[in-house]
Amino acid sequence: MERTFIMIKPDGVQRGLVGEVIGRFEAKGFTLVGLKLMSVSKELAEEHYDVHKERPFFGSLVEFICSSPVVAMVWEGDGVVASARKLIGATNPLSAEPGTIRGDFGVSVGRNLIHGSDAIETAQREISLWFNEKELSSWEPTAKTWLYE
């Protein structure tokens, strides 16, 4: 079963949107297999956003992610990576469709509430950065028979 990494960023935590975000993923039929509220070290933030290290916003992005707790999550389900990206919406909340998390709650690119892995390979890398295997629970929700053929 496919897995993805989702992080509710400091602005989402501070605005009290954790339950709303989790509810949307649950309503979509995905299974939560890892969850933790945590303060992010500068080293972890830099490693996570390594792909952006040459971009002018890298320093402020790292500083922002370290500024307040985040909620790190691993979700599981058929096609969860692509489906989660649609649920999250465009990076710029002003371009995000209504009904998406960013479209409904996002304010600006720099405060766009949530991060989601953009590919299966990226998800695997990010999950291993934020979680060890013992922190992930494999379980079978009873609703699964009502979601998948």
Swiss-Prot record:
InterPro entries (UniProt xref): NDK-like_dom (IPR034907), NDK-like_dom_sf (IPR036850), Nucleoside_diP_kinase (IPR001564), Nucleoside_diP_kinase_AS (IPR023005)
The keyword rRNA-binding is annotated on this UniProt entry: no
Keywords recorded for this protein, A-Z: ATP-binding, Cytoplasm, Kinase, Magnesium, Metal-binding, Nucleotide metabolism, Nucleotide-binding, Phosphoprotein, Transferase
SUPFAM superfamilies per record: Nucleoside diphosphate kinase, NDK
Principal location: cytoplasm
Record-linked CDD domains: NDPk_I (cd04413)
Needed co-factor(s): Mg(2+)
EC numbers on record: 2.7.4.6
Single GO cellular component term: cytoplasm
Matching SMART domains: NDK (SM00562)
One of the Pfam families matching this protein, by short name: NDK
GO terms (BP aspect): CTP biosynthetic process; GTP biosynthetic process; UTP biosynthetic process
Binding residues annotated for ATP, in chain numbering: 9, 57, 85, 91, 102, 112
Record localization: Cytoplasm
Keyword Cytoplasm: yes
Catalytic residues of the enzyme: 115
Entry-linked Gene3D superfamilies: Nucleoside diphosphate kinase-like domain (3.30.70.141)
Reaction equation(s) it catalyzes: a 2'-deoxyribonucleoside 5'-diphosphate + ATP = a 2'-deoxyribonucleoside 5'-triphosphate + ADP; a ribonucleoside 5'-diphosphate + ATP = a ribonucleoside 5'-triphosphate + ADP
One example GO MF annotation: nucleoside diphosphate kinase activity
UniProt superkingdom: Bacteria
Family to which this protein belongs: Belongs to the NDK family.
Complex formation: Homotetramer.
Stated role: Major role in the synthesis of nucleoside triphosphates other than ATP. The ATP gamma phosphate is transferred to the NDP beta phosphate via a ping-pong mechanism, using a phosphorylated active-site intermediate.
Protein name per Swiss-Prot or TrEMBL: Nucleoside diphosphate kinase
Organism: Crocosphaera subtropica (strain ATCC 51142 / BH68) (Cyanothece sp. (strain ATCC 51142))
